[in-house]
């Protein structure tokens, strides 16, 4: 234990994937960031609500690396702790457009870094929206595109973001080299793109996956003759 350190818990639903909250990982993280003491729930109890409650009651900040429903449950537990409730950083989609949450995108506006620092609850931006918002919001704020502009956001991602089954399909050669998905135009990132992009019209979002493990390309085509300024 580091005297005076900020105590941080990481809650994950799996010990596999992009983040594995093993004991060695916790020790490495604590040593890598002076002043931060990282805690987690033992792997065999990682889905136990009481174990999650116990660790959240001991820390200053909790990072949620959970599916949406599990993240909502974890926030309910945190809220029930009253004065012992930690600050929450949620990496899921569950709270990105929810009232009472601050969007963790410091470049969004001049006041966003201060809002994040002061917030008790911060929602981590999604991967696709980070690219889309970074492209669109400055143009909206500067008045170059109207808030009701009919935006189309195209994005290509590597396959590692699709989870275990997608990774296996691409790496064993059974997946197509390129695949468009979300063709019902109801992708879970659309509300986030619209709200923090600063637009009033629902964007058309066209996500796709390419045959490469990591990386992302996001583009937003615009008609030059419709731009202001």
Residue locations for each model-derived region?
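Low-acidity, Ser/Thr- and Arg-rich intrinsically disordered low-complexity segments
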Residues: 1, 6-8, 13-30
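Generic low-complexity segments that are intrinsically disordered, proline-rich and/or Lys/Arg-biased
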Residues: 3-4, 22, 35, 50, ...
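General secondary-structure edge motif
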Residues: 7-10, 119, 173-174, 200
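N-terminal Rossmann-like NAD(P) cofactor-binding subdomain of oxidoreductases
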Residues: 16-18, 29-183
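Short Gly/charged-rich anion-binding patches and loops
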Residues: 25, 51, 73, 188, ...
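Charged docking surfaces used in two-component/phosphorelay signaling
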Residues: 62, 162-229
């Amino acid at each position: 234990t580091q005297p005076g350190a900020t105590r941080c818990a990481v809650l994950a639903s799996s010990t596999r994937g992009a983040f594995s909250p093993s004991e060695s990982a916790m020790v490495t993280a604590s040593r890598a960031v002076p002043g931060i003491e990282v805690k987690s729930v033992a792997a065999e109890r990682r889905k136990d609500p009481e174990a999650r409650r116990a660790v959240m009651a001991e820390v200053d900040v909790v990072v949620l690396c959970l599916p949406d429903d599990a993240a909502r449950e974890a926030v309910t537990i945190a809220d029930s702790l009253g004065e012992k409730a930690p600050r929450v950083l949620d990496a899921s989609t569950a709270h990105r457009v929810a009232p009472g949450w601050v969007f963790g995108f410091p470049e969004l506006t001049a006041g966003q870094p201060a809002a994040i620092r002061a917030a008790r609850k911060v929602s981590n931006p999604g991967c696709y929206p980070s690219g889309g918002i970074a492209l669109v919001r400055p143009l909206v704020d500067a008045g170059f595109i109207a808030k009701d502009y009919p935006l189309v956001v195209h994005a290509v991602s590597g396959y590692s973001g699709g989870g275990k089954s997608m990774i296996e399909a691409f790496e064993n050669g059974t997946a197509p080299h390129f695949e468009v998905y979300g063709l019902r135009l109801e992708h879970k990132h659309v509300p986030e793109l619209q709200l923090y992009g600063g637009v009033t019209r629902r964007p058309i979002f066209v996500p796709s996956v390419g045959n490469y493990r990591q990386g992302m390309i996001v583009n937003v085509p615009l008609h030059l003759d419709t731009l202001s300024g």
